[in-house]
């Protein structure tokens, strides 16, 4: 769903910032 992909994108960006 939309929220699932949004969460995945958030984790991806978050790990990139770290």
Curated annotation (Swiss-Prot):
Localization: Secreted
Primary localisation category: secreted
One of the protein's GO biological processes: defense response to fungus
Tissue and organ expression note: Expressed by the skin glands.
Keyword DNA-binding set for record: no
Cellular-component GO terms for this entry: extracellular region
Source domain of life: Eukaryota
Leucine amide sites (modified residues): 18
Keywords: Amidation, Amphibian defense peptide, Antibiotic, Antimicrobial, Cytolysis, Fungicide, Hemolysis, Secreted
Function, in words: Has antimicrobial activity against Gram-positive bacterium S.aureus and Gram-negative bacterium E.coli and strong activity against yeast C.albicans. Enhances the antibacterial activity of XT3. Has strong hemolytic activity against human red blood cells.
Protein name per the record: Antimicrobial peptide 6
The species this protein was found in: Xenopus tropicalis
Lineage: Eukaryota, Metazoa, Chordata, Craniata, Vertebrata
